[in-house]
Design a protein with these regions (language model features):
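N-terminal capping/lid subdomain adjacent to the active-site entrance of alpha/beta enzymes
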Residues: 1-175, 182-189, 193-197, 312-335
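Active-site cofactor/co-catalyst pockets and adjacent glycine-rich loops in catalytic enzymes
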Residues: 303
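Short helix/strand-capping turn motifs
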Residues: 296-299
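Catalytic core of soluble alpha/beta enzymes
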Residues: 150, 155-293, 307-319
Length: 335
């Protein structure tokens, strides 16, 4: 097998408007872009990393450069899991290996993943934290959305007012909320009661990472999803008895290879499986679309926040997401 040529670059993506969550405001998204080619075929990958784990551009590019010789030697995707730890660096390289393998094999990446076909998936569209009025207006603006996720900030009365207004504006949609680690166990019972009154069907990451034990024995009428609390396959057991849903993000776990493994083990442990993404282009969304084929909840709206996406792009239509082979993972990708 010929040696691979690795190229690594970084890009700053402009957001159409600031994206607010508990404790953070994002105005741009910085991503690492990786290509691998063997002189005939090429694979590409993109990752934003995990901001709350200091997995930023510098960390990702340094990790990839340190492993350059091993990556250019052409490892398998499983071998890559031993070369790079979970995180954005591995996610970007993993995606490039998937696309390269698909091109070499002459089959789309989803077939390599064991699928016989792919279908559009229902995805949430996210309302970032803002004033009550602005958030309700944004929900109305998502006219074709069938599922909406609301970002909370840990301010109980304000958060419930936000949810109340959005539910009144959109009584028709599946509604979930993401607390982004903004609450304590002491406030959680009141939050859950208030959310249930407005038919909220998912509460994501209510407590800070590291406080998972506080949820042991907590009886919630709304399913609780682990995001920041479960980064990779090794952390899945920590969610048992504390969460109902596992939100798998390829930037967290290190790519589609481990993401598929996580989904399988999570189901075996009795969890529902959700797929999410960091803010990025369609190139980052496309590998997650393969995982989405196996998930009961899909939150893959990252490209919708950007001023400009890559072309070709994933397609959002009537509340659904579809990623064609031309976006990433085609059966033929010339170097």
């Amino acid at each position: 097998m010929p040696r691979l040529k690795l190229d690594v670059s970084v890009e700053t993506l402009r957001l159409a408007q600031p994206f607010r969550i508990a404790g953070h405001v994002f105005e741009t998204a910085e991503v690492v872009f990786v290509t691998l080619d063997d002189g005939t075929h090429r694979g590409r990958g993109e990752a934003a990393g995990v901001y709350y784990m200091q997995d930023d551009l510098a960390h990702m590019t340094q990790a990839i450069e340190r492993a350059r010789a091993e990556i250019e030697a052409g490892p398998t995707r499983q071998e890559l899991r031993q070369i790079l730890p979970p995180g954005g660096a591995r996610a970007a390289v993993d995606a490039a290996l998937w696309e390269l393998e698909a091109a070499r094999a002459g089959v789309p990446a989803w077939r390599l993943a064991g699928l016989t076909s792919v279908r559009p998936v229902r995805t949430t569209l996210t309302v970032s934290a803002d004033t009550v009025e602005a958030m309700a207006a944004r929900a109305v603006g998502y006219a074709h959305a069938k599922a909406i996720k609301v970002k909370l900030t840990g301010e109980l009365d304000l958060d419930l007012a936000r949810v109340r207004a959005i539910r009144a504006a959109r009584p028709d949609v599946w509604l979930g909320v993401d607390a982004n680690q903004g609450y304590t166990i002491g406030k959680l019972p009141e939050l859950v009661r208030g959310l249930a009154a407005h038919r909220v069907l998912l509460l994501e990451q209510p407590l800070p990472r590291g406080r998972e034990a506080d949820l042991q024995g907590f009886d919630s009428v709304i399913p609780l999803a682990a995001d920041e609390s479960v980064l990779s396959l090794a952390e899945l057991p920590n969610a048992i008895g504390r969460f109902d849903v596992i939100n798998i993000k390829l930037d967290k776990c290190g790519g589609l290879t481990e993401g598929l493994m996580m989904a399988e083990q999570a189901r075996e442990l009795g969890f529902d499986v959700m797929v999410g993404t960091m803010i990025g282009t369609s190139l980052a969304t496309a590998p997650a679309f393969i995982l989405a084929q196996q998930c009961s909840i899909v939150d893959l709206d990252g490209p919708t926040f950007l001023v400009k996406d890559r072309l070709p792009s994933v397609v959002y239509r009537d509340g659904d997401l579809f990623s064609g082979d031309d976006v990433w993972g085609a059966a033929s990708a010339a170097a």
